[in-house]
């Protein structure tokens, strides 16, 4: 039975894990790392790079290198968060035909789901190369505070990558699974998850294989990227004060600043001071300029203090919804790379009144939890019951633009809820059901998930027709809504497709594109491998020709030299079949040379063997004595 993998699709880094016996194992990628940068780049030659290779070239290609794409997934172009993001990233964010926020490279538009799919494809390949078999099913994690549109877009990304997404699981819940799988006694835990782009807090009761989420809260636009940008702005401002040049207008310099900021942030978690050195960051008429700034941990903490403080309000709200006080939490589990920052740990300790638990790897624990959930779904992990919740209230718009809740936030999922509504006017023959998600009292202030019409209602005075609206949330947190006229039995239902979102036809096209890209990548990799083999053969043949060329006839020598020249010409192109054919031709042409080399080495061995045999008699006695006279030898 094919394995189901667990993928943590992160804002900054992604990670893949699989169940290995009773334990979840994180799989190393082709570069030997346990996490992969969530970065996709397109080069000028139209090559697609994913992960570390994409990150390495970001400085020289900032406009076509997409990072933190998770912040755009499932968002409309007009979303205030997208407006904010446009000011922070060097790449182009554009409005798609459906009103969603997409990105553009070399004139081609890509949806965030497509870019995410490229990262998922890389994780899929990583798992396939480790397992030695095809992988078609996965459990993918999302921030607990993701709304329906963001969850649906993540599921679409999986589909585009050629994966059947068996379950979308919340990141803090996945972390709790990995942390608490072997815990028998009952505990109430808080999972504080501050990652690269999002923040989540979940309160769970765990024990004896049952993981029950009591409440969840968070901020889908708060994470390490924001900490980096604070530092980038500070460095740019300091440089402007000193040199009078504004680096914020130079995309290349900004990308170098971003990389330096990320590195400095990581260093300051373990040391109290670091130095940022960026030679030749820019130049003016007086010559090149260099940036050199010393940064203390205290200074960095003062720059980001409000960002750390922003995590506390969601913690308060989550505790309130769970009906608990901070003192009733038995353990606080830290998840996400940003929780390595001492200031974050100190803030968590002060709020919850206890030292946070640091026994899990904050970068890997979410992927491990996803793998455990995959094991549960596959039947490999027994006696585990996971009860998650919906993070936001769901309802419809009613008369006067009021938001009428049908399902409150923190309701255990899967769940189903119905309520009867009626018409607002006499003889109304159709109603539009507008579905919203959020906590505000007016519908317009919440997130519109989608809308549909129920038509063919028989004419009647207002308030008479009975229209039953049913909300159904599945275990992925994805919503289905139906409306039924109880009088006629007419029913209309929709799987909520975000008011933008990708249509089935678009997803299908993207799946085909992804497959074609995977095929192109495979061909490119194949060509590189064939070239490597060809170059190795050229090198070894040239060396043999130099050493043993005089052992073959002039005609054979010429044939070998011609075959080498033809193969060299073939390796300058990209035709793998042509390179293979010329490699075979050279291998055949150089067989005579190989024979000559073999015969020469045989002759050498034979000569060496005769000498050894000849000298054996004299040497026999020498093994036992240190000194032997010629006279003694004769008398012996």
Curated annotation (Swiss-Prot):
Gene3D superfamilies linked to this entry: 1.20.1270.10, 3.30.420.40, Actin, Chain A, domain 4 (3.90.640.10), Substrate Binding Domain Of DNAk, Chain A, domain 1 (2.60.34.10)
Record bears the keyword S-adenosyl-L-methionine: no
Phosphothreonine sites (modified residues): 198
Biased composition (Acidic residues): 621-630
One Pfam family of this chain: HSP70
Region (Disordered): 603-636
Reported induction: By stress conditions e.g. heat shock.
Domain of life of the organism encoding this protein: Bacteria
GO molecular function, one term: ATP-dependent protein folding chaperone
Keywords attached to this entry: ATP-binding, Chaperone, Nucleotide-binding, Phosphoprotein, Stress response
Keyword Iron: no
PROSITE patterns, A to Z: HSP70_1, HSP70_2, HSP70_3
The protein's role, per its UniProt record: Acts as a chaperone.
Family the entry assigns: Belongs to the heat shock protein 70 family.
Name the record gives this protein: Chaperone protein DnaK
Organism of provenance: Chelativorans sp. (strain BNC1)
Lineage of origin: Bacteria, Pseudomonadati, Pseudomonadota, Alphaproteobacteria, Hyphomicrobiales
């Amino acid at each position: 039975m094919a394995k189901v993998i667990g993928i943590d699709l992160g804002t900054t880094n992604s990670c893949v894990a699989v169940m290995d016996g009773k334990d979840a194992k994180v799989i190393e990628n082709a570069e030997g790392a346990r996490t992969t940068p969530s970065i996709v780049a397109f080069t000028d030659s139209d090559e697609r790079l994913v992960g570390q290779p994409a990150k390495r070239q970001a400085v020289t290609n900032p406009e076509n290198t997409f990072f933190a794409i998770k912040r755009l997934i499932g968002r409309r172009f007009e979303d205030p968060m997208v407006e904010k993001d446009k000011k922070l990233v060097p790449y182009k964010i554009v409005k798609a035909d459906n009103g969603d926020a997409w990105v553009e490279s070399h004139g081609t538009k890509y949806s965030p789901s497509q870019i995410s799919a490229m990262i998922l494809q890389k994780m899929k390949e990583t798992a396939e190369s480790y397992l030695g078999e095809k992988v078609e099913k996965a459990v993918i994690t999302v921030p607990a505070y993701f709304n329906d549109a963001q969850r649906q877009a993540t599921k679409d990304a999986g589909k585009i990558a050629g994966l059947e997404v068996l379950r979308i699981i919340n990141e803090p819940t996945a972390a709790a699974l990995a942390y608490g799988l072997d815990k028998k006694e009952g505990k109430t835990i808080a999972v504080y998850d501050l990652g690269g782009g999002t923040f989540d807090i979940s309160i769970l009761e765990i024990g004896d294989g049952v993981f029950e989420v009591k409440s969840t809260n968070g901020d889908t636009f708060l994470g390490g990227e924001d900490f980096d940008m604070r530092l980038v702005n500070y460095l740019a401002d300091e440089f402007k004060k000193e040199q009078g040049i504004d680096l914020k207008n130079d995309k290349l310099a900004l990308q170098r600043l971003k990389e330096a900021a990320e590195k400095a942030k990581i260093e300051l978690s373990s040391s109290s001071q670091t130095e940022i050195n960026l030679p030749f960051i820019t130049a003016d008429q007086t010559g090149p300029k260099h940036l050199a700034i010393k940064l203390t941990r205290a200074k960095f903490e003062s720059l980001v203090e409000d960002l750390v403080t922003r995590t506390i309000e969601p913690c308060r709200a989550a505790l309130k919804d769970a009906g608990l006080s901070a003192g009733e939490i038995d353990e606080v589990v830290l998840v996400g790379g940003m929780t390595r920052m001492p200031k974050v740990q100190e803030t968590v300790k002060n709020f919850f009144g206890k030292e946070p638990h640091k026994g899990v790897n904050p970068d890997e624990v979410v992927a491990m939890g996803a793998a455990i959930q995959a094991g549960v779904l596959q039947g490999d992990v027994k006696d585990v019951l996971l009860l998650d919740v919906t993070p936001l209230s769901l309802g419809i718009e009613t008369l006067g633009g009021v938001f009428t809740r049908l399902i409150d936030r923190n309701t255990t999922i899967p769940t189903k809820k119905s309520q009867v509504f009626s018409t607002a006017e006499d003889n109304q023959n159709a109603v539009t059901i507008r579905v919203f998600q959020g906590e505000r009292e007016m519908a317009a202030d919440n997130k519109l998930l989608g809308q549909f019409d129920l038509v063919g209602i028989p004419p009647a005075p207002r308030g008479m027709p009975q229209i039953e609206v049913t909300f159904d949330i599945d275990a992925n947190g994805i919503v289905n809504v139906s409306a039924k006229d109880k009088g006629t039995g007419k029913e209309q239902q929709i799987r909520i497709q975000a008011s933008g979102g990708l249509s089935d036809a678009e997803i299908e096209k993207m799946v085909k594109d992804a497959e074609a890209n995977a095929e192109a990548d495979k061909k490119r990799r194949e060509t590189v491998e064939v070239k490597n083999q060809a170059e190795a053969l050229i090198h070894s043949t040239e060396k043999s020709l130099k050493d043993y060329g005089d052992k073959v006839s002039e005609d054979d020598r010429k044939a070998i030299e011609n075959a080498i020249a033809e193969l060299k010409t073939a390796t300058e192109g990209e035709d793998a079949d042509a390179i293979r054919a010329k490699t075979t031709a050279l291998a055949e042409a150089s067989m005579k040379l190989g024979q000559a080399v073999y015969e020469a080495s045989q002759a050498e061995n034979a000569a060496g063997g005769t000498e050894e045999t000849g000298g054996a008699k004299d040497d026999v006695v020498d093994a036992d004595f240190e000194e032997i006279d010629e006279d003694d030898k004769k008398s012996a």
